[in-house]
Amino acid sequence: MKIAAFGEVMLRFTPPEYLMLEQTEQLRMNFVGTGVNLLANLAHFQLETALITKLPANRLGEAGKAALRKLGISDQWVGEKGDHIGSFFAEMGYGIRPTQVTYQNRHQSAFGISEAKDYDFEAFLAEVDMVHICGISLSLTEKTRDAALILAQKAHAYQKKVCFDF
C-alpha cells in the first residue's frame, strides 16, 4: 500500500537545551510538518510513502527534499515554487515556562502560494492508494484550501481513501 500526504514542509529552528532565543547564538534546524511526521512513521513500518507539496527553488528546497528521503518519504511529487519556505522558532518549555512558537512568512511559503493547477493530481492519484490531507492546507490560504478540496474530490472520483487531520 502506498500512502501519500498533501501538506506543508516547514523549517523548525530550536534553541539547544531549553534555552530561549535571547540566551543562545545556536539553533537546531529540522524539516517538519504534519504530513512529514505521519509519513516518516509509516515509512518506519516499511510502508511506501510520498509527499505532494511545493518547496522553494533554492538550496532550502534541496535540503528539504534530502530530509524527506532520509526519512524514507518519496520526493517524486515535491515540486518547486517561489523562494520561501515556511519556518518557525520553537523555544521548548521548561518547568512552568510554556513552549513558545513564533512563525515566519508562512503565507508566502512555496506551499502557501501554490494552487491546484501547480500539481498533477491525476498522475499522483494513479500511483497511491490513500491520501492524507493535512489540516493546514485547508486553513493556510484560499489557494491551498481550494487545492486540498480539489484533491479530495479527485481522490473520491479515483476511489482512493482520503483522511484528514484537523
Predicted regions span which residues?
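A generic secondary-structure signal marking the coil-to-beta-strand transition
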Residues: 1-2, 9, 85, 99, ...
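Glycine-rich phosphate/adenosyl-contacting loop at the front of the ribokinase-like
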Residues: 1-74, 115
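General beta-strand structural signal in soluble alpha/beta enzymes
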Residues: 5-6, 77, 103, 162-164
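Short glycine-rich, flexible loops that bind phosphorylated cofactors or substrates
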Residues: 13, 111, 139-140
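Amphipathic, non-transmembrane alpha-helical secondary structure
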Residues: 40, 118-122, 126, 146-149, ...
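Conserved N-terminal subdomain of the carbohydrate kinase-like
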Residues: 48-135
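Conserved beta-alpha-beta core of the PfkB/ribokinase-like small-molecule kinase fold
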Residues: 130-166
